[in-house]
């Protein structure tokens, strides 16, 4: 038989056991509940970037059922779901080259009919831009040349670099917006190496650059010829001369042929002069001259310069209609000079010096002229030259004979 005291002890023991069991149950439940936490992405990287796509990869902490991938609009602050998947890699496609995009990944875990969502993990990624190809040299001059290349889709501009031999590295030349550029202030008959890359400015302001192109070599032409002129002119010959062009190996000389209607090469020269002989008086010719040099095993040329040249025309014979002049007025006559373009008439108050041009006759068949306003000198002297027009100047004959007359002023 259980005594009252024993009943009391038993009751206390039962209550204590119940309390212990309740505490254990609550502790076990709390421990279990604490383990069910939302998974979190700990790292997100752009594993591969292309011109129209970006492949992202990420790492996660915690148990995961799947992932939701979003694009994030920085202006509207809104997420747009792209895909739900279980893999930790995703390729975002149909993108624009050279642009920035914000991609977010949000993991989730499902348990007991509930979904535990992690935080959005955002990452700004960038598409690439194509490498420049198709570089060509469009023009070649002594101190500059023009390069052009295939236009890169999405490019906002291009960076150009050239190889500096002294610095032994590529240095910046400049930036252009179009797919061509002209490089100037270069050394003639030389080789220059270039690399070019495209760039775009993303919507977030970041500059995205392509890889540099393969090295491209361009050349400059031979130096341009200057000072091309005719000298030592006679009735049957003359000399063509010009200034020596730095870095030139030689010169090509051409003469226009009326028979073929084109220029024909008459000489390849190392010197800076060429004598023309065996001509008739007042015979005209047109010449072209250009320098050359050899660069990278290829012959390059300078600009072509043109010169019109002629031998002297025959000197005319003149006479006066009268040996007496009245009130500074005189009439001159002379013979027509074959192939001349006109005549210059000169007057002086001295027989051997001081002759000045008084009048030009611009017709070869006009062989008379009346001069007025000759002044009050007692004796006046007259000479004439025939001329041939060449380019912007003249080739004149020797002076004619000298005629004189007394000048009477009434």
Q: What is the meaning of each model-derived region?
A:
Residues 65-68, 156-158, 249-252, 285, ...:
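Short beta-strand/loop motifs in extracellular/secreted proteins, especially
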Residues 24-38:
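Sec-dependent signal peptide cleavage junction
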Residues 68-96, 159-187, 252-280, 344-376:
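Recognizes extended acidic, P/S/T-rich segments that occur
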Residues 34-62, 97, 115-154, 188, ...:
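Pro/Thr/Ser/Gly-rich low-complexity, intrinsically disordered linker/stalk tracts
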Residues 92-111, 183-203, 276-297, 371-392:
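Beta-strand-rich modules
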Residues 4-17:
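Bacterial N-terminal signal peptides that target proteins for export
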Residues 44-47, 82, 104, 135-138, ...:
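Tandem-repeat architecture and repeat-register "anchor" residues
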Residues 62, 73-77, 111-113, 153, ...:
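Solvent-exposed strand-loop boundary residues in beta-sheet-rich modules
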């Amino acid at each position: 038989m259980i005594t009252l005291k024993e009943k009391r002890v038993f009751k206390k023991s039962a209550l204590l056991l119940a309390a212990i069991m309740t505490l254990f149950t609550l502790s076990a439940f709390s421990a279990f509940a604490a383990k069910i936490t939302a998974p979190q992405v700990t790292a997100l990287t752009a594993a591969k970037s292309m011109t129209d796509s970006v492949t992202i990869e990420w790492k996660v902490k915690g148990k995961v059922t799947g992932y939701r991938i979003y694009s994030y609009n920085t202006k509207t602050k809104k997420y747009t779901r792209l895909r739900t998947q279980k893999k930790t890699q995703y390729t975002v496609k149909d993108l624009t080259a050279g642009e920035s995009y914000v991609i977010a990944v949000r993991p989730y875990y499902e348990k007991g009919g509930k979904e535990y969502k992690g935080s959005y993990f955002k990452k700004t990624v960038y598409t690439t831009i194509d490498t420049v190809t198709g570089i060509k040299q469009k023009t070649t001059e002594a101190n500059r040349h023009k390069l052009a290349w295939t236009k890169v889709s999405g490019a906002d501009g291009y960076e150009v670099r050239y190889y500096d031999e002294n610095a032994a590295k590529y240095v910046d030349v400049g930036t252009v917006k179009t797919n061509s550029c002209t490089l100037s202030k270069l050394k003639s008959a030389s080789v220059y190496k270039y690399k070019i890359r495209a760039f775009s400015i993303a919507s977030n302001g970041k500059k995205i650059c392509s890889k540099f192109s393969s090295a491209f070599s361009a050349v400059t032409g031979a130096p341009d010829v200057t000072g091309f002129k005719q000298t030592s002119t006679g009735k049957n010959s003359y000399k063509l001369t010009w200034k020596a062009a730095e870095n030139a190996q030689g010169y090509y000389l051409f003469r226009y042929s009326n028979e073929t209607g084109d220029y024909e090469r008459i000489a390849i020269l190392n010197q800076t002069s060429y004598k023309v002989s065996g001509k008739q008086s007042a015979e005209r010719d047109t010449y072209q001259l250009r320098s050359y040099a050899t660069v990278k095993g290829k012959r390059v040329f300078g600009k072509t310069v043109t010169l019109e040249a002629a031998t002297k025309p025959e000197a005319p014979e003149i006479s006066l209609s009268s040996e007496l002049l009245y009130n500074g007025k005189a009439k001159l006559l002379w013979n027509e000079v074959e192939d001349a373009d006109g005549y210059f008439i000169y007057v002086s108050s001295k027989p051997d010096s001081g002759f000045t041009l008084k009048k030009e006759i611009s017709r070869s068949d006009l062989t008379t002229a009346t001069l007025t306003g000759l002044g009050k000198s007692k004796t006046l002297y007259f000479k004439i030259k025939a001329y041939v027009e060449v380019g912007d100047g003249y080739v004149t004959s020797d002076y004619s004979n000298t005629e004189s007359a007394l000048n009477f002023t009434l």
